[in-house]
A protein has these predicted regions:
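Single conserved hydrophobic/aromatic residue that forms the stacking wall/gate
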Residues: 1-6, 10
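Low-complexity, highly charged intrinsically disordered N-terminal segments
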Residues: 11, 22-60, 64-65
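Short beta-strand elements
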Residues: 131, 135, 216-220, 243-247, ...
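FAD-binding subdomain of flavoenzyme oxidoreductases
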Residues: 139-302
Length: 431
């Protein structure tokens, strides 16, 4: 076939999916703007006409988060809730004025950060105003190398924050590069404000802590005025307002500014490791000893049960490497073995010693080293699962994850109970 014929064939093959891949125009004729024109004009005076939108596309773009339910509704063109107007504030002062105005006139107000919410917290169920923080509300307010802190507007994205910190010598005249240390799976499409108000945890939280450990101070625009928490890391009095505000998901006000701890970025000191254990019990005991041995913490610390291990080894092509015959030879059986991987960060000596102690404990519990190959494979795709979910939906498959906090003493029982329930569901694959 000619090149033109092949192109036409490709286009034709997409016709069956043309109503399901988002290329068709957005039409919200069933959801007209309900907010009175005088309110929209007043909002234009606050943020400027260029930062106000009532177009169908912009209204729909902030109406949903990223749960499977949200994505399925969008794919089926089911629109339950949209805001009447979308605002793109530039300054904290503008946000404070918007909050005051919406409070005075009883107008519902919602906030949209990176859009990766899985709690339906961004859905404007009562219409009104949606503040889209992505376009303009994403600037650095201050950088303090002595205190090792940075203050940013709440709409700054994870990648932009990390790029800024790693460019600190060029941008701020800093002596070295820095990192925030917070890398949730939603990193590429989430904001600093979103991390804070959802009290998130990242993939490197074993070493750097969750966002509750990283945030030092917050500023909110509320119906009763501005709330600014203390800039100190610890206080002798309580309750701790900083901790109360984190996790509030916008119920107390609009988060405008966040001060974060930052850490020295030393990727050259990173030590990657991966081990395979013969059983889930041995893997759990090894992991617990690693965390309780008082010899430091790795940055990434991931343990997979037999089912997830089976999938991950295939994804990382381990079954096509010389490692597979070795696993079979030494009795690491499929659907019994468990994968453990991670890496250490920090000062050179610290990073090296943590990795050494992890190796010592892993070998004690029968772990077999798999080199850093598996960990590097995981790193390459650490933020890819959401993309995989969307692709699988094209084939009628819906994927999702479960999260919970456990103690070491009830970890095995919770794991067994959750697996039992999931396996009992029809047409369900558990990994």
């Amino acid at each position: 076939r000619s090149r033109r014929q092949r192109q036409m064939c490709i286009r034709d093959s997409f016709k069956a999916y043309s109503d399901d891949i988002g290329f068709d125009p957005v039409d919200l004729s069933d959801h007209p703007v309900q907010l009175a024109p005088e309110h929209i004009e007043a909002l234009k005076k606050i943020v400027g006409e260029q930062n106000v939108s009532t177009t169908d596309y912009d209204r729909l773009s902030v109406a949903y988060g990223f749960t499977a339910y949200d994505i399925l509704r969008l794919r089926h063109k089911r629109v339950d809730s949209v805001p009447d107007v979308v605002l793109y504030p530039e300054t904290t002062g503008q946000v404070e004025q918007i909050v005051a105005y919406s409070t005075e006139h009883h107008i519902p107000l919602y906030v949209y950060g990176g859009g990766s919410s899985v709690t339906r917290g961004v859905e404007p169920v009562k219409g009104g105003i949606s503040l889209d923080m992505r376009r303009n509300f994403n600037k650095v307010i201050s950088f303090n190398e002595i205190d090792q802190t940075i203050t940013v507007q709440a709409g700054m994205s994870g990648p932009d924050l990390e790029k800024t910190l790693q460019s600190a010598p060029e941008l701020f005249g800093a002596k070295r590069q820095y990192t925030c240390g917070h890398f949730p799976q939603s990193f590429e499409y989430s904001s600093v404000g979103g991390w804070t108000v959802t009290r998130g945890a990242g993939q490197n939280s074993t070493y750097y802590g969750t966002i509750a450990d990283i945030v030092l101070s917050q500023k909110y625009a509320t119906p009763i005025g501005t709330i600014q928490t203390s800039h100190y890391s610890r206080e002798a009095t309580g309750p701790n307002l900083n901790q109360i505000m984190m996790g509030s998901e916008g119920t107390f006000g609009v988060l405008t500014e966040v001060t974060l701890r930052i850490f020295r970025w030393m990727p050259q000191n990173r030590k990657r490791f991966s081990y395979i254990f013969k059983t889930w019990d041995a893997a759990m005991k090894a992991a617990r000893e690693m965390m309780q041995c008082e010899c430091g913490y790795s940055s990434v610390f991931r343990l997979s049960d037999p089912e997830e291990t089976n999938l991950m080894l295939k994804l990382y092509n381990v079954d096509e490497t010389p490692l597979q015959p070795l696993l079979d030879k030494f009795g690491y059986k499929d659907m019994e073995r468990c994968l453990f991987l991670g890496f250490t960060d920090g000062e050179k000596g610290y990073s090296r010693n943590v990795a050494r102690n992890i190796a010592k404990i892993a070998l004690k519990h029968g772990g077999m080293p798999l080199t850093g190959y598996v960990t590097r494979s995981w790193e390459k795709g650490r933020f890819n699962d959401p993309y995989l979910r969307d692709t699988l939906m094209d084939f009628g498959i819906t994927t999702d994850t479960l999260e919970c906090t456990v103690n070491w003493s009830n970890m095995e029982q919770v794991h067994a109970d959750v697996r039992k329930i999931c396996h009992a569901l029809p047409n369900t694959v558990v990994t």
